[in-house]
Amino acid sequence: YDNTLKQNCYRLLRLVNNLVDMTKIDSGYMKLIFINCEIVSLVEDITLSIIPYVESKNINIVFDTYIEELEIRCDPESMERVILNLLSNAIKFTNNDGNISVIVEADDKYVFIRVKDDGIGISKDIREDIFNRFVQEDKSLNRKNEGSGIGLALVKSLVELHDGEVYLEDVSEGSEFVVKLPNIKINEEVNNHNRVMDVESKPLVQKINIEFSDIYELY
């Protein structure tokens, strides 16, 4: 009972957080704190932190990159939410014994964060609308993959606030979401100032509990 109550509280908190943030974005009050962030470590740490969860669902997850270190202008708090949301979606639609891979690539202009899975994929009729609000892949009344339908819309908005874009690759199996961010840094004076402004964030495990709160099975 206690676990059910806690999970439902996390679900409600996730919904409220998403609605509040979408309202802030719509009204122009969503302010990000940009610093020079080590993006490879950020994505790797998030990926590794969810291994115990995906293993409990018999899903294999791997992180891969050829980049050792790379700092870019980024708001770590919002980028964590972006990556966790994409991973949450990948887990929802990946069957037991499935595979998820997270890949970081870069060229002179952009950084690419790829979240790939070999799950059921996304039907062609909603691919163009998948980042719109309240669009869900599973629309059945007895759907087992619950959600508010605003997660990917929020992902799109947060990435665009980074002057980036998020899109869905055309793959033959599963799905592949790509976050494309400018490969730029801010000057050190602004970076140091923003690091002082950056407030202490929630522990990563709590963020995972919130973002993954709607992954469950209905029997």
Task: Give the predicted meaning of each segment.
Residues Q7-L12:
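Short alpha-helical segment of the dimerization/phosphotransfer core of two-component systems
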Residues I59, D163-G164:
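Conserved glycine-rich
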Residues I122-Q136:
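Short conserved segment of the HATPase_c
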